[in-house]
From Swiss-Prot:
This is Proteasome subunit beta type-3. The gene is psmB3. One of its GO terms (biological process) is proteasomal protein catabolic process. It comes from Dictyostelium discoideum (Social amoeba). The keyword Cytoplasm applies. The 26S proteasome consists of a 20S proteasome core and two 19S regulatory subunits. The 20S proteasome core is composed of 28 subunits that are arranged in four stacked rings, resulting in a barrel-shaped structure. The two end rings are each formed by seven alpha subunits, and the two central rings are each formed by seven beta subunits. The catalytic chamber with the active sites is on the inside of the barrel. Its main location: cytoplasm.
Length: 205
């Protein structure tokens, strides 16, 4: 088994009209053994930027703690929050710096950029090779199942309600096709005025 699939888990980010959504499953396991069903892989950096980290859980937590440390230093020095693009560049550098002994994680970054709240999403592999797009990105053990559903259901310029419905349906449909992730999901929809967070009840087996 790949070390990337050792703990299972999966994340999706999607772009809407002046909003973005990020979702992850809630399972934490060790190979086929389920340890917890309340372990989201999505972390809040600030009100307009979230990071989803799939892969080896120990590395994901270490990477998140280092990212929060860097973000707090930036906030002290600059007196403002990091934008999603800055967070993406920082994560890319942090991962590439450890390329000879990498963190076994695949981060996704999403948020709203600048005063006009332009949606931004990006993802990267374990050594920081980043990809930015304007529709959706998926990472984790159920990637093969997620791609088809996301390509089928995704539409451009969805409002926040449609975006929530679409990302939820993609998540729930994919969870049934992967034994290493599932047990429900959590969805965050980031809008210019608020962050909407909801939990989804999936199959508990």
């Amino acid at each position: 088994m790949s070390i990337m699939a050792y703990n299972g888990g999966a994340c999706i980010v999607m772009v809407g009209k002046n909003c973005v959504a990020i979702a992850s499953d809630l399972r934490f396991g060790i190979q086929q053994q389920t340890i917890s069903n309340d372990f989201p892989k999505v972390y809040r950096i600030n009100d307009k930027c979230f990071v989803g980290i799939s892969g080896l859980v120990t590395d994901a937590q270490t990477l998140y703690q280092k990212l929060v440390f860097r973000h707090n230093l930036y906030k002290l020095r600059e007196e403002r929050d990091m934008s999603p693009r800055v967070v993406s560049n920082l994560l890319t550098n942090m991962l590439y710096e450890k390329r000879f002994g990498p963190y076994f994680t695949e981060p996704l970054i999403c948020g709203l950029e600048g005063p006009d709240n332009t949606p931004f999403i990006s993802g990267m592999d374990l050594i920081g090779a980043s990809v930015a797009t304007d529709d959706f990105l998926v990472v984790g053990t159920m990637t093969p199942a997620m791609y088809g559903v996301c390509e089928t259901l995704y539409k451009k310029d969805m409002n926040e309600d449609d975006l929530f419905e679409t990302i939820s349906q993609c998540m729930l449909a994919s969870l049934d096709r992967d034994a290493l992730s599932g047990w429900g999901a959590i969805v965050h929809v980031i809008t210019p005025t608020q962050v909407i967070t909801k939990k989804l009840l999936g199959r508990q087996d």
